[in-house]
């Protein structure tokens, strides 16, 4: 078996090697190349079809194979590839060849020498045939299927090592495929010939002329096909024939047309300080050209300058360029030394000769191929700011090889400028000086270098620590930041913007200069300043130009001046002399000192904006060459702008999108002549115009006019006018049936005759009908609008259509106004006179004169009756008819307005009582309500007449109906009388019948005859016949009929018919009875025929009961199935209900118990780690199925009551017994319980053994050491620190944002009445329920996203938190120090503490000025429901009344209650107790030892600290406009979600009420100056604030309130929240500081100015949004105003516009300076909150990040107090102290922050030390023993004076905070995917490479 497998394995490996070998792969790809058929195959087929002989077939095949072989060789051999594949060569090759081939086929005898005895291979025709096949193969043209197959060999060549073998095998593979193909073609030709020979043999023999003609035509067909194919490929892919297109003038040619005198004078003034001779200019220009154009990769033209690049480009452009023209735009360098460039003179002479070449002296290739020529089908990308035609920025991906970690790697984010610079340096340096190192040597060198640097850095760090141990000052040990200074004595450094040792945002930004176009335009004027070229170094420090004017030559190098320069379009006086000196002497040492001093002189700048004020700088940087256009192309709009300029207008340019210029306003001072229709003012008027673009796709936009369009690939165009391109993949889904849609065209152009069809109405409920109508209405409006847009653009399809339409409209207008309407008036009045009516000439002509035909633009903007729009024949025109004339039969009738066609519009107009007295004229003379809309129905002239006739007819009908009604009533009375008479007659007849019957009986009895059956038919009153039946006694019955008293009467006939029918039915009944009677009657004969015997009676009763039972049985049988089914169902339902009811009760109890048990087991299970065993996260909650505890565990009396989480009374045995009984328990979840550190201490041994036997608990899990000791170090480090005191708003910006928002939106506070709080020790574990709440109800994709986010968040959270002995943390841990603070746990929906807002958090996290979040964040980050907070904020006292000292109480405090404000835990709650707030009150230390201590302001939340009289931000007293804004401004600006927007406008009142209220507040709030109050709460518990009627009882400084409303500076200086007390760097970054500076300068004289300024300056944070519904109305007003401005008497039209609703007066009533209150009340402005964003640099982030917080534990503290901050501005070390960073004891100057030793180093060195230690992490032997040896841990006790300052609980000092990275890199800690190591590849962001240091031990 082993031998067989070995042999089999060898065979497989051998086969794989053969398959992957170069020979097989080459054969395969070469064979595939055969299937790419091109024009070259036409010659092979031609040679075989023509049957010209074997020699020609052989020569054709040989030429074909030779050409293909050369093409294969050209893939490998570069010179041959350049010769055959380049378009230049192919074009030069094809054009003469096509001419020769055409001449060959038409003059064949010219080359035919006849048949001779020489070798036939020497025949010229055979040789030419060989050349034909060879040359056509060179063309490399392909027809079917594409050229991709032929390029497979080229692509695969890069993957093969043995390239020559691959090329050879590819050719062999192609040859095999070619032979097979030709054999197949030969077989097909043989079959065709045989069939043709048998059928047309006679015809061919009889007429030999046809055979020769057939051969000639075959040759011509092949030649034609070849010619067409070649021309197609040449036209599309190769060359654009210059004969077919025009030429553009280049930039230089345009410049030539300017006046030479003006140009030369300006150029000389611009560049030279003194005039020089022509010879000097020539020498200077020659030298500059040789230097400036030495490097082709750095063209100056890319910056937009008009001069050309180099001699190579001049040759390529192929334009004649004289010497003066070429040199006129070159920058003039006076300082360049000609002596250094003597070797360049030969090149200069050659260059001058080349630049003076005429067109016929240039190469042919340059004439035919110009890659920069304008008619190439390329997009013209142009930078609007500069003259450049393409942007110079490169893509973010730039690939280049770089050295990373000692290895050569490809980087995709390599700096392009560095790559370009490297290439330039390679050309400068000789190749022999560059040595290539092996990869191993490079890597070893990198390791050695890194180790040395790490060793040096570590030693430096240790040395600094040792110096500290010896007692040196901390300031001497701390690493100083290097700054550049210009004076040793003054210790003044350069500003951050100019300090080269700094980097980042502190350097500021340099504004981009003017556009080059403006620079060129301004250069013509001498007053605009002088154009200066200096070095890039001088661009950084441009100050002392005059002192160094002649001594700057050292700083100018050839390459530097040629490759980087700066242009200063300055206007200052010192720039006038800034031409660089021509002094050729070296600067001595004395001058060098001066020049170095010059470098430190600073340009005066504005420190606020950090921008240079005097001049803008354009610094040319090293960059990659970008292809540009060498022609100055302008767009259509630029052509229109340049019509009035003197420079010549460009004929060609760039096509824009299809659009029209719409003039919206024309400012004219001269009056126009209204007599002529197209009058123009004498002076050109200023117009304000917009561009209206077409909605149709435009393929021609941004293409150059006249250029040949490129043939798009993979697109199909099959329509004559196709708006969209389609891919062939989707053609099967498009209806491509070709049909001339005449109906669609008629619908577009003739729709003005087509009226809208009436809509069908259906009866439904009112709500459904209204909803449907509204939906249909919107769809209809949208559809109509789209149709109108389509029609408008259909008229723009051709140029002529607008002119035709405009002329038709004008013709229709004249025809209607002056022909149709007057004719109708005449006909009408003549008709009235013929009908003997009075004519109405005056009324009709009055209405006719009232009709106005206003000319409008194409968009409907009204002009006037006589003024036509500009270019209306090309742009289009609309004619609007005001007060359209309607012919009426008489004027007394009140006709309904006919101008409303749509029903919904009709209803709306009826409600408003308005009418639309206008319409638009269509091209067919109809009326439309909107341009290009449907034609509306005009009211009929005869409709009122018909209405009147209808009314009269209705009156006549009414009279006739009355007569008929009277007649009917009389007829009814007559009928009634007749009926009574008839009934009386019937009674008499019945009586007579009865008497006759009696007489008949007497008569027959008297004669002794036997009794016979007598049947008397009587008609009773009910209409039924009573029948007397007697037995038949062997005799026929005698039917006696009653006497016919009333013959032929209707009643008698009915009676007769009824009797006959009844008789028939009775006979049938009797027959059936007789048949049934046989079964029950006995055979005895009846003795008496008139009486029944006993048997008969018995049989009758039996028959009766049998019939009943039979009938009931039949019915029972029929319904038995349904009865049985119903019975079974009832039984089932009863059983099912009984079965469901009991489990329902049990399930209800189980769910309640499960809900209460959830908290207990979540506390026990440490599920902060991801599931390592592959178990789905959604199954984690299986452990919660504890189904049998029910009510025995918890007494749940009320579902909404607060649930206690203290389950300590449950025994362990009972809990684990129930756990073991659970069927679906996930034992992996329980693993975390037993691996938890504290689990072993409380679990009993018996329980452990029992669980171990059950497989739940394993013995090895007791002591489960971590595999990686480095992870142990990490956890040990983490275990020694507190949680970070980050606000949740700040942390929310560091974790995935959207996921966090979704979590917050899902969880809402539900238990509003509960005040139960649990201690930190009991509920440190805040469980994470989003797994259950999310994963169960989400889609699979959301599950995966949630898991991914969870993993990232968990990793980040573990990174920032730790595990200690008492508590274990999961994801939802709160991100603040929670010492003894209590946290909320009173929600139904369990939710993470970090997502809870304001509960158990310091309010300082929300109300600091620095916590302004960015504006680009989503506005859906609402941490709680805004609807639950409603404050009554009319007075400050209301807020004070909410402060409740006692936790959990629901009582309100009295106003006069005293509140002690020491270190007290406050709760702020509204009356409904909807949420709780914790206020961290800070102590005010009265013993301040240093002046450097920063004043930390007391927290001001919504004005709770009462200081409203002089607020820190508003700077106004509360007696101003909208005092509610003043009250809520700080808190709402900082965090808009603290309160809803509705509160801002609660007390919005009129200005009078506001001013009255302000006066009252002003009187009550007098300032008392006897006591200087610091409003920060004192640490003295005796100090308190007493509330009395909303004002503090402390005496305040009295003073008069002046007009500037709150300019009391002293009180403002003492406020804790004053921005001026903040640190200087923070103040510069804060937006409000600039606002406050501006506010100080303003003085106001009245309240109105105060209100306006306060809104514009202070309250821009509230965004005023324009109401979108007003846009339509304002546009209508503008259109009407355009007409009214042109009218002499606009009164009538204005009134009508107001009545019809076109003009809105409420919009016109807006004043120029309205009050904000009125605008908001009118609905014009809508207030929206807007969050501010701040620019944050490294300094600001340092103050915002986490600091070191070592807090004392006092017995009387209920929350943590924060002592004062310490800041020392001299050193960067104190920047690491955060806003919350606190010292151990107040007022201490010792720097105890040195407990973190790494703060000795600077932030950059800190990071370097850590990174270098991490790079060698795999080698444990080389680790620094200081950090990795536990026996050598440093003792930090020497840093602290324990006896004096330390707290007794020394172990708390271990819990300090230490970052892995510097403090300002906090955002990198949470962003896992960010590049942390400053490398250009993203290979080092793995958490596995990060290693921690062990914590420092405090002795």
UniProtKB/Swiss-Prot annotation:
Membrane disposition: Multi-pass membrane protein
Comp. bias intervals (Basic and acidic residues): 269-280
Cellular localization per UniProt: Plastid, Chloroplast inner membrane
Main location: plastid
Organism ancestry: Eukaryota, Viridiplantae, Streptophyta, Embryophyta, Tracheophyta
Family: Belongs to the TIC214 family.
Keywords: Chloroplast, Membrane, Plastid, Plastid inner membrane, Protein transport, Transmembrane, Transmembrane helix, Transport
InterPro entries in the record: TIC214 (IPR008896)
Residue span of region Disordered: 256-280, 1581-1619
The UniProt record lists the keyword Mitochondrion: no
Protein name: Protein TIC 214
